[in-house]
């Protein structure tokens, strides 16, 4: 108990210092910041975007599933360079206010909300809380947000931010709709 009483405040102070250093580094970088969140699909979308955008731009992406405060902080401190043009930031949450906090930290220019589902229902307590939390990215994005209209919970979501809202999907009408998609043993096209 004594060790915990001594170590917890120290750990919090160190975290704050690391995050402050990451915030300062991010503020000094002129890169486009893209936040990606959702109950599922975050890592896949981030990885696909990183592959595509890296063909033309210098990109930094959070590795693996580094999608919480300290994972994002570590990525910014250790991997982001001033020459990076795009920062792809996966943002995960299993409690209320975590996406909002990450958005205040990263200050994304663009957001992508992949899907809303029942993951982390035990900690969020309701589907409404999950939807509200994931949509915090749409509320904090500065320029535009991409919303998956194939997801029944996102399809009619109310977004109060006056930025451009761009829909995407395969099954439902959308601004960007995947068509003629074929999948077989050799892959997809």
What is each of the regions a protein language model found here?
Residues 39, 64, 170:
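Cofactor-binding loop segments of dinucleotide-utilizing enzymes, especially the Rossmann-like FAD-
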Residues 83, 113-189:
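Acidic, Mg2+-coordinating active-site environments of NTP-dependent enzymes
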């Amino acid at each position: 108990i004594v060790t915990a009483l001594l170590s917890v405040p120290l750990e919090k102070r160190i975290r704050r210092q690391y995050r402050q250093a990451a915030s300062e580094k991010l503020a000094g970088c002129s890169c486009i910041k893209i936040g990606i969140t959702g109950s599922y699909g975050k890592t896949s979308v981030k990885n696909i975007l990183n592959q595509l955008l890296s063909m033309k731009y210098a990109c930094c992406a959070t590795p693996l599933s580094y999608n919480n405060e300290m994972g994002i902080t570590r990525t910014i401190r250790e991997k982001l360079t001033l020459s990076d043009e795009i920062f792809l930031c996966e943002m995960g949450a299993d409690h209320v206010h975590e996406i909002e906090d990450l958005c205040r930290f990263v200050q994304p220019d663009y957001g992508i909300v992949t899907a809303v589902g029942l993951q982390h229902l035990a900690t969020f307590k309701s589907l409404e809380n999950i939807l509200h939390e994931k949509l915090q990215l749409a509320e904090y994005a500065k320029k535009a947000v991409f919303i998956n209209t194939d997801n029944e919970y996102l399809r009619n979501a109310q977004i109060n931010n006056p930025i451009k809202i761009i829909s995407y999907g395969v099954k439902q009408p959308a601004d960007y709709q995947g068509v003629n998609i074929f999948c077989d043993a050799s892959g997809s096209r």
